[in-house]
A protein has these predicted regions:
Chain B
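Structural transition elements
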Residues: 248-281, 297-307, 429
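N-terminal lobe/hinge region of extracytoplasmic solute-binding protein
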Residues: 121-125, 455-505
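Long beta-strand-rich cores associated with HINT superfamily self-processing modules
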Residues: 423-453
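Acidic-aromatic pocket-rim loops
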Residues: 49-55, 333-390, 433-436, 465-470, ...
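Surface-exposed binding/hinge segments that line
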Residues: 49-109, 543-571
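Ligand-site clamp/hinge motif
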Residues: 117, 145-191, 515, 530, ...
Length: 317, 571
C-alpha cells in the first residue's frame, strides 16, 4: 500500500528523470501521470467509465425494454424476487436478475437504462451551468465595474437559497418533467461556476504573461479567449466533475418528489419513489436504484477529487 | 386575647357553615336536571317532560322551485322539544340513509353560535368521545364521554394519529405503538395475514375506481374514441395485478351491493382488436397523444395509484397506440379541476359511497349540474332525476336500468374496479370491526388498556365535518358528533339521536322523534332546536352560522340539491 505522499514523490522523481533524459512533459501529461497515481481517482474513473459503457450499450446489456410490462407475457407478478438460474432459481421461471417492479417490468433493465437518463442529465446540466456561469463569470471578472457588480449580486441572490429548494421552486413554476428538472438544476448550479471563473479571471488578468500580451497590442477579445479563459479552466474542470455528481443527486431528489422524470421513465430517483412504500416487503426494489445513485455519485466524487489533486499546481513543486 | 380568639373561632365556624350550605345548594342545582329525567342503565332510552316554554325554530327555504332555489328542503321545523319535521320538496326515498351520514351531525345551537358557525377544532357532540386536544401535525386526543347513552368506551383515551405511507402505519402496529390502522398496502396483505399479532378487518365499502373523460376536449368529444378506450383497457388485468383480495372488476358504475346498482347491461368486454378498429374508424388509426391525470392518494378504490396509472399508460400504448403522459397533481387541485371539467385528458378518480343508496353514486356523478365529464348527457340524468323522486322501488328499477345503459352507451367514464378495502388491528383488540358505511366508533374497540391508538392516512382538515369531505376528518368527527341516524357494523341504517323518523305516504315529509335526555359534551341538553340550527348552519348560505372551514359545505350542497339562499353563480 503506497501512501499518497509516497506516490507523489515517485511521480515527481519520474517526472524529474524524464525532464533530464527527454524533452519536457506537457502540463496535461503531467496531470495525467499525477492522476494515475491517485488510486481513489482511478477507482472513480473506473466507475464512471463503467457507467458510461453501461449507458451506451444499454440495449445490448438489458434483457428487456425498460418499459415493457410483462403481464401476460411471462409467468411473473409484481415485485417478484430476483431469479438467477445459476444461483439455483427454478429453470422454468423466467430469469430476472433484480426481480420485477410494481408494474411487472424487469428491474435490471430499468436500472441499466436509468444510467442513460442520469448521466445525460448530469452532463447536460453541468454543461449548461459551465457555459452560462463561465461566460458571465469571465466577463464580470474581466470587465469589472457595474457589470461585475450586477452579475455577482444576482449570483449572490441565487446562492442565497438552498439549491434543492430553489430547484423545486423553479420546477414548480416550469412544471414537472425531466427537461424542466434539468433546466432548474442548471440554473441553480450557475453561480458556483460564475464565481470560480470570475476569481480565476481576476487573478490571471494581472499575470505577467497577460500584461505582456497587452503590451504587444492584443485586443480584449483575444486576451480573454486566448490567454485568460484557457488558463482559468482548471478549477472549473474539477468543479464540473464534482458538479455532475451533485446534479445527478439533485435530479434524483426532484424525481423522488415527483418533480423530475415522469413515469414510465426509468429514472433512479423516481424508481425509488415508486417503491418507497414497499421498503419492508420488497427492500431490493428500493436498494437497487438507491445503490445505483450512490455508485454514480461516488464515482464522480472520487474522480473529481483525483482530478483536483492532479491539477493542483502546488504538486508540481 | 381569649375573647378575640373566641370571636375568630365563631367567624370561622360561621364561614364553614355558610360554605357547606352554598355547596349543597349548588349540588341541588346541578342535579335538578337529572332529577327531571328518569334514566335507567339497562335501557338507553330516556324520557323527559317537554318544556311548555319551548320555542321551536324553523329553517324555511321560502318555498320549492322558487327563483334561485331548486333544492330538496322546503322547511325543517322543531315541532316541539323532541320532534323535528323535515318537509321536502319531492319524495325522498333515500332520506334515512342520507341523514345517517356523519356530515349531518348535530351540535348544540349555543356552541355553533359561540363559535360563529366554525367549531373547526373544538366540536361539541353527543358521541362516545370528546375532543381533548388537537396537536397539529401529530395527533388528535379524545377523552371518553362517561355520560354516553350508548356503550361507554372501555378506554379512557383515544389517540388518532396519521401516516401517509401504509408501510409506516403498519410499522406503528408491528412495533406496538398503535392498535389499529386504515388501508394496508396491497403488498402487505400476506404479511398481515401471517402475523398472529395482527388481524385483517375486511371493509366491504362500496366504491368505484374509474377513468373519466371530459367531452368538451378533443378527442374525447368523440363517443367512438371513448368507446375504443373502454374496450381497449384490460380491466381484469388491473384488478388481478394491483388490487387486494375482495376486489372485483366493475360491471357497472355502482357496486351490485347497492340496490339497482347493476340494473342494465354489463360493461364492454376487453377486445383490443375491436378497440383498435373502432379508434381507426373514429379517425385515429395511428392513435394520438393525451395525458393521464391522477392524485397520489391511496384509497380503497385505488390502493396503488402510481402502479395503476403506469399500467393504463402501458395498455393505451400497447393496445391503441395512444401516447399518454402521466401527470401527478396535488390532491385538492386535482379534485377541483376534475370536478369542474377542466382536465383535457383521462383522469383517474374514484368514489366511496357515503350512504347506502344508488343516488349517492349515480346522481352525484351524472346529474345535470355535474360538469366533471363535460356536457351532461340528458339520456343519463333525466331518468336519474325521475328515479330519485320515485318512492316506489318497482317504478324506479327500469329508470335505473335506462340510466345504466345510457352510461354504457355514452361512456363518460370507464368503470374499472370495486376495490376491496381493509383496516388492520392488533390481535389484542376485542370487537374490532370495519364497517361498509360510515366509520368505526372506537367505543366498540377494546384493547384492554386505558388508551387506544389508531393510525389513519392523513391529518384531519378540520373537526367540523359539515364542511369537510375527506375521510380523515369524517373519522375524527364520528367519535364526537352524531347524526339523527347512523350505520351499524353491517352498514344498516339505525336510529341514533332520533328514535325514529316516520314518513308520510309519498315520502316527502319525515317526522323525527328525538332521543330524550341526551346531553352534549358541554353539558347542554339535546333538543329539536339543535337539529334545526345544525342543519341551518349547513344549508342556509345566508345564515350567520354558515361559516365552516371553506364555506363550501359541499355535501349539504349536493345531497340536498343545492343550498338555500345560495349566492348567484358568477358569470
Amino acid at each position: 500500500m503506497i501512501s499518497r505522499q509516497k506516490s507523489i514523490e515517485i511521480l515527481e522523481a519520474q517526472s524529474a528523470q524524464h525532464d533530464l533524459l527527454d524533452k519536457p512533459l506537457s502540463q496535461w501529461r503531467l496531470t495525467l501521470r499525477r492522476f494515475r497515481g491517485r488510486r481513489s481517482g482511478m477507482v472513480g474513473l473506473g466507475i464512471v467509465v463503467f457507467l458510461i459503457l453501461m449507458a451506451i450499450f444499454a440495449p445490448v446489456i438489458a434483457p428487456y425494454p425498460p418499459n415493457e410490462v410483462l403481464i401476460g407475457k411471462e409467468d411473473v407478478g409484481p415485485r417478484e424476487k430476483p431469479c438467477i438460474h445459476i444461483l439455483g432459481c427454478d429453470e422454468n421461471k423466467p430469469q430476472h436478475i433484480m426481480g420485477t417492479d410494481g408494474n411487472v417490468r424487469d428491474e435490471f433493465s430499468r436500472i441499466i437504462y436509468g444510467a442513460r437518463i442520469s448521466l445525460t442529465l448530469g452532463f447536460f446540466t453541468v454543461t449548461i451551468a459551465l457555459l452560462v456561469g463561465g461566460f458571465f463569470g469571465a466577463i464580470a471578472g474581466y470587465v469589472g465595474g457595474w457589470f461585475d457588480n450586477i452579475v455577482m449580486r444576482i449570483m449572490d441572490v441565487i446562492l442565497g437559497f438552498p439549491s434543492l429548494l430553489l430547484a423545486i421552486a423553479i420546477v414548480a413554476v416550469l412544471g414537472p418533467g425531466l427537461q424542466n428538472a434539468l433546466i432548474a438544476i442548471a440554473i441553480v448550479a450557475i453561480p458556483a461556476y460564475a464565481r470560480v471563473m470570475r476569481a480565476q479571471v481576476l487573478a490571471i488578468k494581472e499575470s505577467d504573461f497577460v500584461q505582456a500580451s497587452v503590451a504587444l497590442g492584443s485586443s480584449s477579445r483575444q486576451l480573454l479567449l486566448r490567454r485568460v479563459i484557457p488558463n482559468a479552466l482548471t478549477p472549473l474542470v474539477v468543479l464540473a466533475t464534482l458538479g455532475v455528481a451533485t446534479a445527478i443527486l439533485e435530479a434524483a431528489g426532484l424525481s423522488f418528489l415527483g418533480l423530475g422524470a415522469q413515469p414510465p421513465n426509468p429514472e433512479w430517483g423516481s424508481m425509488l419513489a415508486q417503491e418507497r412504500n414497499n421498503l419492508f416487503t420488497s427492500p431490493l426494489l428500493v436498494f437497487f436504484p438507491g445503490f445505483a445513485i450512490m455508485l454514480t455519485v461516488l464515482g464522480f466524487n472520487l474522480m473529481g477529487d483525483g482530478l483536483r489533486d492532479a491539477l493542483d499546481p502546488a504538486l508540481n513543486r | 386575647m381569649r375573647r378575640k380568639n373566641l370571636w375568630f373561632l365563631a367567624v370561622v365556624v360561621l364561614a364553614l357553615v355558610a360554605s357547606a350550605c352554598s355547596s349543597s345548594s349548588d349540588e341541588t342545582t346541578t342535579t335538578a336536571a337529572p332529577e327531571a329525567t328518569t334514566t335507567t342503565q339497562a335501557e338507553t332510552t330516556t324520557t323527559a317532560v317537554p318544556s311548555p316554554d319551548f320555542e321551536g325554530k324553523v329553517l324555511d327555504s321560502g318555498g320549492c322551485d322558487t327563483d334561485g332555489y331548486s333544492g330538496r328542503v322546503d322547511t325543517i321545523t322543531a315541532i316541539d322539544e323532541y320532534t323535528v319535521e323535515f318537509k321536502l320538496c319531492n319524495p325522498h326515498p333515500a332520506f334515512l340513509a342520507q341523514i345517517a351520514f356523519g356530515v349531518f351531525g348535530i351540535q348544540p345551537e349555543e356552541h355553533l353560535e359561540a363559535t360563529g358557525g366554525a367549531p373547526l377544532a373544538n366540536p361539541v357532540g353527543t358521541g362516545p368521545f370528546a375532543v381533548k386536544e388537537w396537536l397539529r401535525g401529530d395527533s388528535v386526543v379524545f377523552t371518553r364521554n362517561d355520560d354516553y347513552y350508548g356503550q361507554v368506551a372501555p378506554q379512557e383515551t383515544l389517540v388518532l394519529k396519521w401516516s401517509t405511507e401504509s408501510a409506516g402505519r403498519l410499522l406503528e402496529l408491528q412495533s406496538g405503538n398503535a392498535d389499529g390502522m386504515t388501508f394496508p398496502g396491497v403488498q402487505d396483505y400476506p404479511t398481515i395475514e401471517a402475523d398472529p399479532n395482527l388481524q385483517l378487518l375486511n371493509k366491504p365499502e362500496p366504491n368505484i375506481f374509474y377513468m373519466g373523460f371530459t367531452n368538451t376536449f378533443a378527442p374525447w368529444d368523440n363517443v367512438d374514441v371513448r368507446k375504443a378506450v373502454a374496450m381497449g383497457i384490460d380491466r381484469q388485468r388491473i384488478v388481478d395485478t394491483f388490487y387486494p383480495p375482495g376486489s372485483e372488476t366493475a360491471s357497472h358504475f355502482t357496486p351490485c351491493s347497492v340496490q339497482f346498482g347493476c340494473e342494465g347491461d354489463s360493461w364492454y368486454d376487453f377486445d383490443a382488436e375491436a378497440a383498435k378498429t373502432l379508434l381507426a374508424d373514429a379517425g385515429f388509426p395511428d392513435g394520438f397523444d393525451t395525458t393521464i391525470y391522477y392524485r397520489d392518494v391511496t384509497r380503497g378504490y385505488l390502493p396503488t395509484p402510481g402502479d395503476v396509472a403506469a399500467d393504463i399508460q402501458a395498455q393505451l400504448k400497447e393496445n391503441l397506440n395512444i401516447n399518454a403522459e402521466i401527470v401527478v397533481m396535488e390532491s385538492g387541485e386535482f379534485i377541483q379541476t376534475s370536478s369542474a371539467g377542466g382536465l383535457d385528458g383521462i383522469h383517474l378518480l374514484g368514489w366511496t359511497g357515503d350512504y347506502p343508496h344508488i343516488t349517492n353514486f349515480l346522481d352525484f356523478h351524472f346529474a345535470e349540474t355535474n360538469l366533471q365529464f363535460g356536457n351532461p348527457y340528458p339520456e343519463i340524468y333525466e331518468p336519474l332525476k325521475t328515479a330519485s323522486q320515485t318512492a316506489d322501488a318497482a317504478t324506479a328499477q327500469p329508470l335505473y336500468e335506462e340510466a345504466n345503459n345510457a352510461i354504457k352507451e355514452f361512456v363518460p367514464m370507464v368503470p374499472i374496479a370495486h376495490g376491496g378495502a381493509a383496516y388492520v388491528a392488533t390481535s389484542a383488540v376485542q370487537g374490532a370491526y370495519a364497517p361498509p358505511w360510515g366509520d368505526v366508533t372506537f367505543n366498540l374497540w377494546d384493547n384492554g388498556g386505558d388508551t387506544i391508538v389508531f393510525v389513519q392516512g392523513n391529518e384531519p382538515i378540520s373537526l367540523y365535518c359539515a364542511d369537510e369531505t375527506d375521510g380523515e376528518s369524517l373519522r375524527a368527527c364520528a367519535q364526537v358528533v352524531e347524526a339523527l341516524y347512523s350505520y351499524d357494523k353491517d352498514g344498516n341504517v339505525q336510529p341514533q339521536l332520533a328514535t325514529e323518523c316516520v314518513p308520510n305516504d309519498d315520502l316527502s315529509v319525515w317526522t323525527c322523534s328525538l332521543r330524550q335526555g341526551v346531553v352534549f359534551h358541554d353539558g347542554s341538553t339535546f333538543d329539536a332546536n339543535d337539529v334545526v340550527v345544525s342543519y341551518t348552519a349547513g344549508l342556509d348560505a345566508a345564515s350567520p352560522l354558515h361559516t365552516g372551514n371553506s364555506g363550501v359545505f359541499e355535501y349539504y350542497d349536493y345531497l340536498w340539491n343545492g343550498l338555500i339562499n345560495a349566492p348567484a353563480a358568477e358569470g
